[in-house]
Amino acid sequence: MAERSFTEEVKKLRLGEGEVFRGEGILAVTKALLESGVAYVAGYQGAPISHLMDVLADAQDILTEHGIHFENSASEATAAATLAASVNYPLRGAATFKSTVGTNVASDALANLASGGVTGGALIIVGEDYGEGSSIMQERGHAFAMKSQIWLLDPRPNLPSIVAAVKAGFELSEASHTPVMLQLRIRACHVHGQFTASANRRSPFTLREAMNQPRRDTSRIVLPPMSFAHEKEKVQQRWPAAVKFISGRGLNEFFAENEDDVGLIVQGGNYNTLLRVLERLGVADVFGRSRMPLYVMKDRKSVV
């Protein structure tokens, strides 16, 4: 059962190129998925990401128009396993659930997906139920990304950054043949703002085409001896490809880099909180202009 109705809000998902989208973070994520040409989405309810499932359910007409398959999964493991469609086919797919309760349930599917790698972009959108407002034990999804070598995106909590992270996540996944985890903290899920929309895109390769042209690549099956080859592939090919993409696209950001010789490194999701602290200390103003250099890590690649 839906926690909330987004019947009126989903009309904004039809906004075209150059139009201004105004709304909630969860709705912006859905719009970004449409603009990215996603082929399928699966997920399981869980705060703070529950409303994303509600939006997708209420947007069924729009999803159908764009040939997008939406599945309300029986569990987080089922949702994560759905991403296997992107292993052999150039299909962009997304799975969503809460962290870390959901990542615990989905960990086996995620580990196998990360081992074999992907052909199409695979994006795991996790609602990070951590810190103020949390309802669970205080653990984070970062540990799961580290153990399975999944690239973790942690955007600054504003709509343009979140939308850009969704799109970059698919591109990074395709460039490095690795699933990408998009971390949305509690406030990022429900932040309100605006961004300039782009046109929605249909997937150039459809699920129907995948079913009519089945492919089988035994080298992607996570069993010996290929599972050992996957480990070499992770370090020798996927990791360098990810670093090249992240560096080339400038996913991590510098602010006020010429202001001083000493600065701060901050995770993207903590950017707003840091600026508020600096403003209280007189080192930044209320408009977010810092007099201290800041290196904002929106992408955190795992270390083997």
Residue ranges of model-derived segments:
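Flexible, low-complexity linker and terminal segments
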Residues: 2-26, 156-304
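Thiamine diphosphate
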Residues: 47-174, 185
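Residue-level recognition of beta-strand->loop/alpha-helix junctions
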Residues: 45, 97, 296-298
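N-terminal signal-anchor module of multipass membrane proteins
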Residues: 9-49
